[in-house]
Amino acid sequence: MIENNIISDHFTVEELKKLKITPPDAKMYKKIRSNWDLVAKPLDGMGDFEFLTAKIGAVLGDENIDISKKAVIMMCADNGVVAEGISQSGQDVTLAVAKSMARKASSVGRMAMTAGADTIPVDIGINSDESVKGLLQRKVRMGTRNFAKEPAMTKAETLEAISAGIDIVRVCKADGCRIIATGEMGIGNTTTSAAMAAAMLRCDVATVTGRGAGINDSGLERKIRVIESAIEKYDLYNKDTFEILMTVGGLDIAGLVGVCIGGALYHIPVVLDGVISMVSALAAGRLLSGVTDFIIPSHEGREPAVALLCEALSVRPVIRASLALGEGTGAVMMFALLDMALSVYKGRTTFDDISVSQYERYV
């Protein structure tokens, strides 16, 4: 299990960008796709799950794909921009939900138990000094600064959060974990993720900004104005990814950037949750080439940025249920679907087993 005394390696931005990633095994990917063709079913009959499981096997370097040991890492942090009235909830909700996560009583905790996954809730920046049993302590600071007034984080704080995410994945790998899901909790993080999406994609703020946990029309207008003002204030359309993350991102997002990078470094597939995880993955991939080869999409969330982020990440989520819960719930739901798909793959009922001629691939 992960303990609170993890010691992280700290990187400079330049060192971070120079980390070496060994790509997934392309031959293994082809082998697994060929194995799927031997299963008694129409060619490509399992749809996206055939290439997604092949991708997982290529990351793990094993055609006998084993994802029995799973974990969901939930980065919990507060965001100073909440002071601008962009959420109907206060920062006290972040701590309350994090406590529920620590007891495995939150939505993702219930779902993880069903999926057979460990839960790793992380205090990477909750605005409280309360010690919570079951909450991994990796606090960088007590919430970010209000980016409407000043940059959310310093360079050192951003790097510390990224480093924490990488190191947690390292420990998961050492503990035998075979696949990881991303999750988060932080009031105001649909604002930080929308700001990052708009800046990284260089698109209109309104096209990527949604209602989050359910703000009204005036709240949405205020949220858009706050983000627009920040992009103009810091000239973010002309800044690089790290500066965007540091300026309008959150500690939860920076931690998940580290999780995505850690998945690539330690060859553990990373199943993304919704918009906040997608923003984190896009930032990670832009900071370090090759990271996105290790990510697996799960669901199309309700936030409007999702479609553009999926396009930028070249991913196609398989779950379309208008989810907007966060915490990693969609990613954990994907665990169950992957297990079912792999039961077909590993069961290997062949055409000979059912006395049927094998399909031939013509295209």
PLM features per residue range, with description:
Residues 2-363:
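N-terminal loops that bind phosphate or other acidic moieties
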